[in-house]
Every structure is written in C-alpha cells, then in structure tokens.
C-alpha cells in the first residue's frame, strides 16, 4: 500500500480554491470582476450574496457556486471572513477538481494557513479509482492529517465487495518521511470482517518506501509447501535492494539479493544473487547426484549482473554476466533467470557472459568485448572456446572523394582461449568497394569487390607453443540487381481493416531481386576453427528472390507517425555454379533449399512470424519456425510457437487465455516435445476478475526429463489482487498479455 497516504491530501484540494484576494461576485445579473495575482479570478454565484463591511464577511445563500480554473465548489451556504481568512461551507457541499470529487455536509478551512476540517465526507479520486468516506477529516498542521471513522475501497458498487475501515488514522511529516498510525483497521469482504488489527503503524513517504513484500504461498508434490517473502529497502534516491527469504519445503531456505542502481541517466544496472543449501542432496558427498556429468552439491547459487554506462566523448560500456553453480540450477530455479538469459539457456543451450564497450561515430564504429560461454550440454567447459578479448573496427559505406564509388571496412582482432585444445590469436581485415547505380531510373544495380586477409597464430595444448603466423587471403565479389513495382489502394477498398487500424491508404510493393556472388577456393584445412569467419566456402552462385510488403498510411499523421509496414514476405533460393550444396540428408544438390520468411504485425489483434526452408528435391521442409499471437476484443489470447529442424528439434508450445462467463478467465500453457514424443510442461488455472479485485489459482505440472534424471513435479499456488492496493501471490505472465 505504498503511497496510499496521499489520498488524505486530496481532502484538502479545496485549499487551492481561494486566497485572500478580491472576488468576482454575481448577484442576479450584477457582477464585479477582480483579478487575483496567481490563479485568476474567483467567481461566486448565489441566489443571495451579502457583504458585511464591519466584519469583512461575505455570505452566500442558495445554490452557491464558487469556481477558479478547474476547481469548483457548490453548497447551499458559504461564508468567507476576509479578515480571519476563515471559509465555511455547509449543506450538500460538492467540490470538484478535474474528475476528482469531494462530497460533504460541512467544511471549515483557513485559506491562509490551509488548515481545516470536513465533515461526513465522501471522496472519489479518478486516477486510482479510490472511494473514501470519513466522519471527519482534518488537516492539523504542515504534512499532518487525521481521519476519523473512515473507509477506503476501489469498488464502484454502492455495496462494495471489499473495503478497509479505520477508527482513526493519523499521518505526519509526509514530505520528509514519517509514520502513519492507524487505530482499529479492519478488512471487510462482502461486509464480513476477515482481518482485524487493534493498532498498526506504517512508514509514509512521497517516494519509494521500504517494507516487507506480501508473501507468496504455493505447494510442490516433490518438496512440499512453499512460502516466498521479501523485504524492499529504498536506502538512497538512486539505489534500492530487495532481500528474499524463501522456504522451499524439503529443499530448505533459499536467500536472494537484488540490488538496483541508477547513478546517472546513462549509468545504471542491476545485480542479483541467490543461494540455497539444498537439503535434498544426500549428507554423504559420495552420494551426491550426478546429472549430465555434473555433481549437484549442497551449496547451490547463481548471480546475474547487468550494467551500462556512458563516458566522456560518447564512449560507452555495457555488461551482462550470468553464472550458476550447476546446470541443473537452470531447471530447478528458472524463475531466478533474467528473461534473455532464460531464452539462451533453453534455445542456444548456453549461458553467455559478455562485457563490451566502444564508441560510435557518424561513419565509424569501435567495439571491444570479452565473451565467456557456459555450455549447458557439457559437464565441463574446459574445451569451450572463450573470446578474451575481441576488438572490432568498422567503417560504414561512404563515398570515395565524392565519386560514385563507395568503400566500407570490417576488421577485428580476436584471441580465443580455453583450458583444453587449440588456442589462437586472429586478425581479420576485409575492405570492400561498391558501385551503386540506377539503370533507366527503373533498375537498382550494385556491384562490389573485396579482399579479405586473415592471420592466425595458434598455440598447441598443453605446451602453449606457437606454430607461427599463418595467413589466408581470399577475394569476395558480387553484383545485385532489383526493381520495385507497387500499387496504392484507397482505405475504402478494405473498409473493415482500414477502419480498425485507422489507415487512409494501403501500398502493396513487389521487389524481385537477382544477384551473383563469387569467392574462390582457398586452402584453409590447416587453420583452426572457432566461428564462421574461419571457413569461407568456395562460392560461385546465383541468388534470386522476391520480396512483398504491405504498407499502410495513417489517416492522421503526427510527429511520430508515418507509413507503417504491416506485413512482409520474402522468398529466395541459390543456384550453385560451382560446388553443390549439401542438404540435411547429406545429399549433394546444386539448388539450395527455398528459404522464406513471413511476418504480420496487425497488433494488438494479430502478430505472426514464420520462417522455413523447403527442400526442392523432396518437397518437404527441413526447418520450420512459427510464432503467432492472436487476440480478440473480448481479450481472449492464443499464443502458438512451433519449431522443427529435421532430426534435431521438434516442439510445439501453446499459451492461451479464454474469457468464459463475464468475469471468469481460464488459462493454460502446454509444451510438447514432438521429437521425444512426450509433454514437457503444463500450466492450467482460472482467474476471476471483478471490477475492483481478482483472484486465481495456478496448477503447474512439470514432466520428468527424457533421460529420467529429473522426476515429475507438480506445483499449486493461489494469488489475489485488490485494484490499486496490492496483491498476494504471482499471476502467470500470459494473464498480462
């Protein structure tokens, strides 16, 4: 409930309504206008307006209306003493500021000290949807408030499903940070008291607030009940931290620390550390389980660090460090992993830690980096190649002495290191010259030629002796020609979709392309292999394809709006004039697979991406990858992901959310490994969404691993949320899609 004390200050927005300056008054048709110094005129209208010069008192009776700017006050009666600056209004008092509303029977306020009271008050704050009542609300000092017999809810119903009540609450020193003291707070659910405290105290601040986080409760059939709690500590304006104390049943206690900082706008980062002494491991080290060649010990941990920083002269530094004590940690505690790290661990089967920095100019770029890889498929990384370091320099395409010729440059120095196996230093220099032109103002033509020089100095393990520098030179040349056809359609041609996305015109473009690429055969068998740079294949091939685009022009163009690409389809193929290609089945073919990419971006209702490679000899796909998200106006969602690489990967994943009867959602996820013929994980649940609260439950079923080293595990947890107040538990990510 951080910052909820701010609602009390809204009781006193009326203090901004007036100041001790002359008024504009209207009695019938008569009016007098006098301008205030700061906020414009105060306008008073009433059936009867009286001014007593002796007491310097204005009295207004009957349909009183007082207004200044977007603030307005209505009442049956009002009185302002211009000497004491006391304002009193009574009888059906209604105060508005924008969409915020205060109703009360009586208000008393000193417009100079801005201290006062309101009685029998009802308050509505639009932004937070707060409905507040109080028998008496009082501002008794600077940043000092008191509310008696009050209630709070975010429900719009006259009989709210839930509410908080309090006998008295007092808040002090809001601006500097202080304490709120509540007497007799009670939480009601459908008029039934379910939680009572005789007394409570809470810190109040205008900025971030330290305190305990609401705990999360769950259950695992393998390890028993789970209770996850934490403490948030905002110890500086530019730094904060969260401490986690989780009880994971038979596993025992798991601790965590997350530290966040933002020293400047361009220097910020986050560090996370987690530790558990896993009690499920046997007491005897000789009996520790071995999974995929790794021994799982008692003490298990992980840390993840992200950092970015800018230096003078536009130099920058970024880092992303990921480390786990054992690879099984990625499965047992995957909720600890940052989202990008989780994707790498599942798809690329590796954890990557990288630190890089450099500088970008208009026409050049300099990048230096170190990269360390943790291969999660291997028990040891002794033979895994690490880049320590790699320095790259790029010259972007630019004219040569303002001629039609352009040049660009790709260059790098890399040092490859590992505990076991060949190490090497490599220098790579690749300058290129290109000549772009237009033929008959219809065809786009570009030819290019480049010379690539690569130097190696290898070190043999274990003696670390060098075989001296070795070199490889090769030529890369090519040409490409393309054109573009297009047709423009009026938005009324596709009326429904044009109105839905507010598009005035559509443009369909077709871009056929043909190109040629040549690189001679070079002797490189004796050179080490670390990445794609180390093996440049003999190339003598023609490439042809076609690209289609669907572009929409918005009805109203603003500063940031413009033509938007809603869809794109690319189809391409290579034909070898030299060595044949080798397909997934190991056969030699002169025609490559037909590659294709398709994506649609009709968000929020439909977004899809598809890519694949079709073998033209078997007329079957060697690879297919599909990702689609569909949503309707009822907020139903379907997410489908399918991956198929012949002989290596075959999986399908579903995430869905369906609205049944009005407030009830059903949701689920299902991940299936088609290659192994077994399901991987299933998540099912339901959520009830009322206007001001929601509640749900989640059942998670994790299947055993294909090698049977991990047994099946089932988890269950519930969550509950009060609108704009807080939540207990954690809802699945796809409920927020």
Residue spans of the language-model regions?
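Bacterial N-terminal signal peptides that target proteins for export
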Residues: 1-9
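Bacterial Sec-dependent signal peptides at the C-terminal "C-region" and cleavage site
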Residues: 17-29
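Bacterial N-terminal signal peptides
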Residues: 8-19
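Charged (often Lys/Glu-rich) extended helix/loop segments that serve as interaction or gating elements
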Residues: 26-153
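Outer-membrane beta-barrel proteins and related beta-barrel translocases across Gram-negative bacteria
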Residues: 100, 106-116, 123-153, 157-167, ...
